[in-house]
Amino acid sequence: MKIAFGMIVFNGDFVLQECLESVYPYATQILISEGPVRYWQDQGFTTSTDRTNEILDNFPDPDNKITIVHGQFEEKDGECRAYMPHMRDDIDYIWNLDSDEVYKPEDIEKLIKVLEEEKYTSVGVRSCSFYGGFDYYIGGFELARDNFLR
């Protein structure tokens, strides 16, 4: 199964490295749109001002999976559309994620197994929130219910 991960990011250096590390082994392709939406442009921003671009430029990509589109966007949906023309023709699924999402390998593997067994057109995943690091869980969906499909 070939999965493209699509990400939008602007000033997202907090867990961007961990996000990329968590999905890279499972990706056929990673498509990233980096840049501000209109609100941030109106505040004078033209690109990320934290370490986002440094992380993107230096992330190890030995398999040439990553495509980065830099730009300024009207809204987030336009930012997503900016990377779509770069998606390979042989991709089975696109997994949209935010730059602050980190996945455990067992969760990605479980979802891939489900997708291989059934041909779903849309799948949602549960989330949980952390504060100050991955040790401090502050909320999210009930983790005991291990149900990825909606």
Where are these regions (language model features)?
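Short hydrophobic beta-strand elements that form part
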Residues: 6-7, 31
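Short beta-strand-to-loop acidic/aromatic patch adjacent to the donor-nucleotide binding site
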Residues: 90-104
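Cell-envelope/extracellular polymer assembly enzymes that use nucleotide-activated donors
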Residues: 2-4
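Short, well-formed alpha-helical segments that are part of the catalytic scaffolds
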Residues: 12-40
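Active-site-proximal specificity loops/subdomain of glycosyltransferases
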Residues: 33-92
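Short, solvent-exposed loop/turn segments at secondary-structure junctions
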Residues: 10, 37-38, 73-75, 100-102, ...
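Conserved catalytic core of nucleotide-sugar-dependent glycosyltransferases
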Residues: 84, 104-150
